[in-house]
């Protein structure tokens, strides 16, 4: 991905303000300068990462302040759509130069052909080399986009951007919907970036390990951390440890100030009673006694006021310390009815072939609370297999039989009715469950109080996933087999952690189709199944090796 030195590469924002049409501010006075090299832009869903990239790319206009970009900029958005009838060379933006080269080679030396080519006489060789570096060496320039898989289409669009020799490259969730092979090719491209500025938004931890620094977008401001994802997490842990100490010290200070204030009140009251008693014994003149009482009252008020001020200051310091603590809520739910005895047969697949994908004859038996990762190239048929396991899709031959209640959570999250509230969506899947029981469980899925009444159609991406997960896991009868299709796609890392904590509470069998290896390893996978023309047992190490090698599966076969 390297290219000639780009001295003009620069990205900066000065006092940047951006507000949505409803008047909501996303950024208010944001200023930053992005250094050369690879920067990972991290932050929760809704923090504004994609919006910031679009502002850098000039696709959105600031409401105030300025964005300055120096050099040639290229932007890879999250959602890529290409005309399926488009030829690969046209998608790469080199079709006119190729045509001019062919014309000159055939003897047509009109000036217009030379003007089209300019100095780019090796454009075809560069295009093929770029495709090859991204694992698309088997893709011919005359093929159509419709012959490529979804992952290959993303890599093709990236190749087109690289051929522009950008000084600034913006990548927005580039590994979404990429299989492990395509991810590895993209990782290699990021590893090879040497000059200019690369900014990548991603929830892919393996990708974020490859950047030079992390820029965390949080509450409308940016904090910088040197190194990749692990270094960033270590820095956050150190910060949180220090913040925890500060909070404990602030709590202790508040308690001390409260104690001293109470002691002061007692002392002042005791002194006033004592002075009043003395005045009575001395039979002091009323005017003298009154003056002495007023003086004592003022002295006591000053002393109390001093300690009250100290207590207020201690409480303010406590609030500041508490704000520095990150509280990423976790899903902790009890699901005892999902438990499956260790020896019980949960799922049987015999000699299965599918109408779509690559599976020609696959067999599999799942017993007890096994946790199975289903891996394979894009187009291999993982989603098709999951649909066949649910009975939603009839296999071409063979059979799949579930011996326990099962639930399927698809990528599209279409288990939700957008017109219904979160609570009503769960009630649909859990007939016979009382409203109080539903709300009690939803609170554990972080939908507390009025949040459970929110219509599903108004939820953010992470909230929508939690609602769909709740409707799936809280279903009646309780699912003892759970099928998940690419569950971490489009989730921020906080939502991935919430999913992981929810699955820790699940006691049934799991089958998860995913390309997210760190996630799979975090949920305690016990078996790895590779889907190709058969269902084959494998392991995490082989999966990494297999999909890290371009020779493992030729481009264009997925």
For the regions a protein language model found, what residue spans apply to each?
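Conserved beta-strand
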Residues: 13-16, 25-37, 65, 349-367, ...
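Catalytic Walker B motif of ABC-type/P-loop ATPase nucleotide-binding domains
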Residues: 169-173, 178, 409, 481-486, ...
């Amino acid at each position: 991905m390297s290219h000639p030195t780009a001295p003009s590469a620069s990205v900066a924002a000065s006092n940047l303000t951006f507000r949505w049409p409803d008047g909501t501010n996303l950024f208010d006075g944001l200023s930053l300068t992005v250094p050369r090299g690879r920067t990972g832009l991290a932050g929760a869903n809704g923090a504004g990462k994609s919006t910031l990239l679009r502002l850098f790319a000039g696709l959105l206009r600031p409401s105030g302040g300025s964005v300055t970009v120096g050099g040639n900029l290229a932007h890879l958005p999250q959602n890529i759509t290409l005309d399926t009838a488009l030829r690969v060379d046209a998608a790469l933006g080199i079709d006119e130069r190729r045509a001019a080269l062919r014309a000159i080679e055939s003897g047509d030396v009109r000036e217009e052909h030379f003007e089209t080519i300019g100095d780019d006489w090796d454009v075809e060789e560069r295009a093929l080399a770029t495709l090859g570096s991204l694992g698309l060496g088997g893709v011919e320039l005359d093929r159509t986009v419709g012959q490529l898989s979804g992952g290959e289409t993303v890599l093709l669009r990236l190749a087109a951007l690289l051929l522009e020799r950008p000084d600034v490259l913006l990548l927005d969730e580039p590994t979404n919907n990429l299989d492990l092979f395509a991810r590895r090719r993209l990782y290699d491209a990021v590893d090879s970036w040497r000059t200019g500025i690369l900014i990548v938004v991603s929830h892919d931890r393996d990708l974020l390990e490859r950047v030079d620094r992390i820029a965390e977008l949080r509450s409308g401001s940016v904090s910088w951390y040197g190194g990749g994802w692990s270094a960033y997490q270590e820095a956050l842990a150190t910060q949180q440890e220090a913040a925890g100490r500060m909070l404990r010290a602030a709590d202790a200070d508040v308690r001390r100030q409260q104690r001293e204030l109470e002691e002061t009140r007692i002392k002042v009251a005791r002194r006033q009673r004592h002075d009043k008693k003395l005045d009575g014994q001395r039979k002091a003149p009323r005017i003298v006694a009154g003056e002495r009482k007023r003086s004592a009252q003022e002295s006591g008020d000053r002393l109390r006021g001093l300690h009250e001020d100290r207590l207020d200051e201690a409480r303010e310091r406590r609030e500041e310390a508490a704000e520095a603590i990150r509280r990423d809520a976790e899903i902790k739910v009890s699901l005892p009815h999902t438990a499956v005895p260790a020896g019980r047969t949960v799922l049987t697949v015999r000699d299965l072939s599918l109408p779509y994908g690559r599976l020609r004859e696959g067999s599999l038996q799942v017993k007890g609370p096994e946790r199975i990762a289903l891996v394979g190239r894009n187009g291999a048929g993982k989603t098709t297999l999951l649909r066949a396991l649910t009975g939603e899709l009839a296999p071409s031959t063979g059979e799949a039989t579930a011996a326990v209640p099962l639930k399927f959570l698809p990528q599209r999250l279409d288990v939700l009715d957008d017109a219904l509230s979160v609570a009503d969506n769960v009630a649909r899947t859990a007939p016979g469950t009382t409203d109080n029981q539903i709300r009690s469980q939803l609170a554990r899925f972080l939908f507390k109080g009025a949040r459970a009444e929110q219509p599903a159609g108004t939820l953010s991406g992470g909230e929508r996933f939690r609602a769909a997960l709740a409707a799936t896991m809280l279903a009646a009868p309780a699912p003892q087999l759970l099928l998940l299709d690419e569950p971490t796609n489009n989730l921020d890392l906080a939502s991935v952690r919430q999913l992981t904590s929810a699955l820790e509470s699940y006691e049934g069998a799991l089958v998860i189709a995913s390309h997210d290896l760190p996630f799979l390893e975090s949920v305690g996978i016990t078996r790895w199944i590779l889907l190709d023309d058969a269902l084959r047992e494998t392991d995490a190490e082989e999966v990494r090796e297999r999909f890290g090698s371009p020779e493992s599966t030729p481009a264009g076969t997925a």
